[in-house]
């Protein structure tokens, strides 16, 4: 995992649990690296074990692309997915969404970078994810 990504994701799950009563929070790690698409088997496992999902973190070109493609794979199977990307990859995200046939997928957008930030900056990103992920899941998020 990228430096601070785990802190951001676990912090986001904790922050979201203040508003949402999760019966369980699951974490998945791709065996072949975070910049690859999830395998069909992993997608099916996620679908079977979750009602809503964060896919993350799109903070480089390949990571952004796989984050969006994973979210689309989950959305196609009926699981609301909130892909988390950074400000540097907003345009790439728009292009990817259109190219793979889901232009209306709304991402969560946090400040770039992710790796070289302070604990206070981690908390700022967690706060943004808490707010925007709920907007995505409820269909209230405006496009980027």
Residue ranges and their predicted role:
Residues 1-77, 82-100, 106-144:
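Metallocofactor- and cofactor-centric catalytic cores in central/energy metabolism, strongly enriched
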